[in-house]
């Protein structure tokens, strides 16, 4: 069983896919269910579980026989080494993304050569880097403290997160009423009531979510490279955002009035911003999902059996065979958000046009969030099975339709937990960073606010990878719960006490 450049590992002989784990729905993974005696037969120092030979250090997929001689297999390369030729999925969208990035760089360089004052931009960019330098150590320290507490009291931490978010919501609604913003108070009041209803309707899922988050924290502790990947993506994002601001400012520096060409350039820059942002975000998700899926299908409770350098291999797959799929999925979200952006502009025109555009903008906003969330699940499937975006989307849709209640409960508990923790971090660390920057007395306070927005991206990054990791484990459990039963039986028993695996519909 060899790691595949398109998916987590190569397909079995007779059940070939496009380079992924297995054909979903067939469950021909060789894992199989344990019999009444757990099928723990010993043979030559190996444990045989319904045709699956499990060494102390590595799990190997087998067929119905106790041994499988790869030397007699015509497709032995599938099991033992990387394929000689990588299959690039959705290659067209990789090319399109590269073309629009070349256009963006060209526009930026041309604008920069014409602008008389580049020193000002460099000074402001250094201020942003200063905020990043101050923020990251504080965030990592806060995250490590939270991680240690959560590993000890996972269920209580989730409950505490809910109640703290509820209290914050009540205080915020009171603030809105005090300032006379009654319409917004009604909106947030309805949201708060929905949150309370959700908590009491699905509170029986809290122990399961707590166990999953604890498993993810264990993986991150074992492979801190996941955090490194996350912060590298963050740094790339911050550098790109500064360059984008440079390009927007300097492209329109001399424009006393806007022509049709000016509007076209501006729309392209907005399009470039959205598409690049989502590509960076989903690439990070894909890398982390690939590592977590490797842990799910290969490793035991002590991480024995993990392939070498799983994070590096997952990064390689995300930047090669899966990058076209990432660019394709990101483009879809980008296009919907462009519709929202255009409607926001036309909504400023008074009359019926404003009302229509506001309604359309609201619909586009909801659809953007739905598509963004759907893509997170889809890219987990892309990382696991190495298939194209369309094929992965179809499988993701079927899994979500057949298991909507479990996905809904787990997703929202995870999201609200991360939101409440991030909110508390923002209040504490944001106050510290603001005080430090105030004592430095920056010349341009407006630019400070722009950099504080970037600070929000830094704040959420450690929890971003936890969120994507939890969703990946959930997708793996729905796809093939028997895999965990074989590789991690103790964890499977623990999860079975809080989760009805028989009700899953892969």
UniProtKB/Swiss-Prot annotation:
InterPro entries assigned: Choline_transptr-like
GO BP annotations listed: transmembrane transport
Principal location class: membrane
Record GO terms (molecular function): transmembrane transporter activity
Keyword Transmembrane helix belongs to the record: yes
Pfam families, sorted: Choline_transpo
Transmembrane regions listed in the UniProt entry: 91-111, 126-146, 161-181, 182-202, 226-246, 256-276, 279-299, 323-343, 345-367, 371-393, 416-436, 447-467
Subcellular location: Membrane
Domain of life: Eukaryota
Cellular component annotations (GO), alphabetically ordered: membrane
Glycan-linked positions: 15, 41
Keywords assigned by UniProt, alphabetized: Glycoprotein, Membrane, Transmembrane, Transmembrane helix
Membrane topology label: Multi-pass membrane protein
Keyword Membrane: yes
Protein family per UniProt: Belongs to the CTL (choline transporter-like) family.
Protein name: CTL-like protein DDB_G0269978
Naturally occurring in which organism (per UniProt): Dictyostelium discoideum (Social amoeba)
């Amino acid at each position: 069983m060899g790691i595949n450049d398109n998916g987590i590992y190569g397909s079995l002989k007779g059940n070939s896919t496009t380079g992924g784990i297995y054909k979903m729905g067939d469950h021909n993974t060789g894992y199989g269910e344990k019999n009444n005696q757990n099928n723990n037969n010993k043979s030559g120092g190996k444990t045989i579980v319904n045709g699956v030979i499990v060494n102390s250090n590595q799990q190997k997929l087998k067929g119905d026989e106790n041994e499988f001689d790869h030397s007699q297999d015509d497709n032995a390369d599938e099991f033992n080494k990387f394929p000689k030729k990588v299959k690039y999925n959705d290659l067209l969208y990789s090319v399109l993304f590269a073309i629009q990035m070349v256009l963006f760089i060209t526009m930026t360089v041309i604008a920069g050569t014409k602008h008389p004052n580049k020193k000002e931009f460099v000074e402001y960019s250094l201020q942003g880097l200063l905020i990043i330098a101050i923020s990251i150590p504080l965030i990592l320290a806060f995250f490590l403290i939270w991680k240690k507490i959560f590993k000890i009291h996972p269920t209580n931490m989730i409950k505490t997160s809910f109640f703290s978010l509820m209290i914050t919501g009540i205080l915020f609604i009171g603030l809105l009423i005090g300032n006379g913003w009654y319409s917004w108070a009604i909106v947030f009041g309805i949201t708060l009531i929905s949150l309370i209803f959700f908590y009491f309707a699905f509170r029986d899922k809290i122990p399961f979510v707590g166990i999953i988050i604890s498993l993810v924290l264990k993986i991150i502790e074992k492979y801190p490279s996941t955090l490194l990947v996350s912060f590298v993506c963050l740094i790339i994002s911050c550098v790109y955002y500064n360059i984008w601001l440079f390009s927007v400012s300097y492209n329109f520096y001399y424009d006393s009035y806007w022509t049709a060409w000016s509007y076209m350039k501006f729309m392209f820059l907005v399009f470039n911003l959205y598409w690049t942002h989502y590509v960076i975000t989903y690439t990070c998700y894909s890398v982390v999902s690939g590592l977590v899926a490797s842990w799910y299908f290969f490793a035991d409770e002590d991480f024995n059996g993990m392939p070498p350098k799983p994070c590096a291999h997952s990064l390689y797959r995300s930047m090669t065979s899966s990058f076209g799929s990432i660019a394709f999925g990101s483009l879809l979200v980008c296009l919907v958000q462009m519709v929202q952006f255009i409607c926001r502009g036309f909504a400023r025109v008074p009359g019926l046009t404003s009302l229509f555009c506001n309604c359309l903008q609201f619909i586009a906003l909801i659809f953007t969030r739905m598509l963004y969330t759907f893509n997170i699940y889809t890219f987990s499937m892309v990382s696991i099975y190495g298939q194209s975006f369309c094929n992965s989307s179809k499988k993701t849709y079927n899994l979500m339709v057949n298991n909507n209640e479990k996905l809904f409960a787990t997703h929202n508990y995870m999201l609200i937990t991360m939101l409440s923790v991030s909110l508390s971090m923002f209040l504490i660390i944001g106050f510290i960073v603001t005080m430090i920057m105030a004592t430095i007395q920056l010349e341009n306070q407006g630019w400070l606010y722009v950099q504080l927005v970037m600070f929000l991206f830094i704040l959420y990054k450690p929890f971003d990878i936890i969120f994507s990791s939890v969703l990946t484990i959930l997708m793996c459990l729905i796809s093939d719960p028997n895999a965990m039963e074989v590789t991690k039986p103790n964890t499977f028993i623990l999860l079975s006490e809080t989760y009805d695996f028989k009700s899953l519909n892969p």
